[in-house]
UniProtKB/Swiss-Prot annotation:
Source organism (scientific name): Teredinibacter turnerae (strain ATCC 39867 / T7901)
Recorded coiled-coil stretches: none
Keywords: Amino-acid biosynthesis, Cytoplasm, Diaminopimelate biosynthesis, Lyase, Lysine biosynthesis, Schiff base
A Pfam cross-reference name: DHDPS
UniProt name for this protein: 4-hydroxy-tetrahydrodipicolinate synthase
Active site: Y133 (proton donor/acceptor), K161 (schiff-base intermediate with substrate)
Residue numbers marked as site, Part of a proton relay during catalysis: T44, Y107
Positions bound to pyruvate: T45, I203
Family membership: Belongs to the DapA family.
Localization annotation: Cytoplasm
EC number, UniProt record: 4.3.3.7
Assembly behavior: Homotetramer; dimer of dimers.
Length: 291
């Protein structure tokens, strides 16, 4: 169920900062037409950090309603407060999301035991499939393989999104968990290698821009056709890089605006992509066949 290309969906906004529901609905339908295997709503790319609680839950609800069971919906419900993560996760279950994605608590830098207790509490309190999410470059905390292994035995915890871009880390976690635990890449540039080593798919920023290509790459890699997947991925390499010229989702929103899907608005403290990067990102989009 949780395999392949899972788009880390942007949250469209209008110039006044309000949420653009029409653009959101059109994006979802486009992704389903293009073959995206799952929708991840209100994660990092979906600007969860600048949505209030009501908006966060409303986006989840509207995504679930628009998808209407056609593919799985994974709701981002992580927070650096366990009580807030609980409220979001409960709301996602009520909205009938298929699963939740919970980033490690950021800024307050919990210990490994703190991480373990945080996730155990959420898994115990809300009966919905839950994915751990380790992205130390953003959170200032790294969930170690031994902690992942402890959590992999907890009911309702089904897998992890790993954004370390380390194949060694993937293999360490695989060695400590059983075959039922799901590994999803959180790094587009290394996702083919990740799947070649037994990963189950990726939660992709690049899929916002080239969903059909990303889905096909995942299908090939998961079928064991790794060299074909690499060949198809090669023209996307400049795009993988360019989408992080500034903090995600600043570049991807510029790209989506360039494609005509939304106006590219962001909420402070994020600001539009610096003009010095426009040509590089546009060239990467051309290389990838996005425009």
């Amino acid at each position: 169920m949780y395999r392949g290309s899972m788009v880390a969906l942007v949250t469209p906004m209008k110039a006044d900062g309000s949420l653009d529901w029409d653009a959101l609905h059109k994006l979802i339908d486009w992704h389903l037409e293009q073959g995206t295997h799952a929708i991840v709503a209100v994660g990092t790319t979906g600007e969860s950090a600048t949505l209030n609680m009501a908006e966060h839950l409303e986006v989840i609800s509207k995504v679930v309603d628009q998808v209407n069971g056609r593919v799985p919906v994974i709701a981002g419900t992580g927070a650096n407060s366990t009580s807030e993560a609980l409220e979001l996760t409960q709301g996602a279950k009520q909205a009938k999301a298929d699963a939740c994605l919970l980033v490690t608590p950021y800024y307050n830098k919990p210990s490994q035991e703190g991480l373990y207790q945080h996730y155990c509490y959420l898994a115990r309190e809300v009966a919905i499939p839950q994915f751990l999410y380790n992205v130390p470059g953003r959170t200032a905390v790294d969930m170690l393989p031994e902690t992942v292994a402890r959590l992999a035995t907890v009911e309702n915890i089904v897998g992890i999104k790993d954004a370390t871009a380390s194949m060694e880390r993937l293999q360490q976690m695989q060695a400590l968990t059983d075959d039922s635990f799901i590994f999803l890449s959180g790094d587009d540039a290394t996702s083919v290698d990740f799947m070649a080593l037994g990963g189950h798919g990726e939660i992709s920023v690049t899929a916002n821009v080239v969903p059909a290509q990303t889905a096909k790459i995942c299908e090939l890699a998961l079928a064991g056709n790794v060299e074909q997947a690499r060949e198809l991925d090669r023209p996307l390499a400049p795009l993988h890089e360019a989408l992080f010229l500034e903090a995600n989702p600043v570049p991807v929103k510029w790209a989506m605006a360039r494609m005509g899907f939304l106006d590219g608005a962001l909420r402070l403290p994020l600001t539009p992509l610096n003009a010095v990067y426009h040509a590089q990102l546009e060239a990467a989009m051309l290389s990838a066949g996005a425009i």
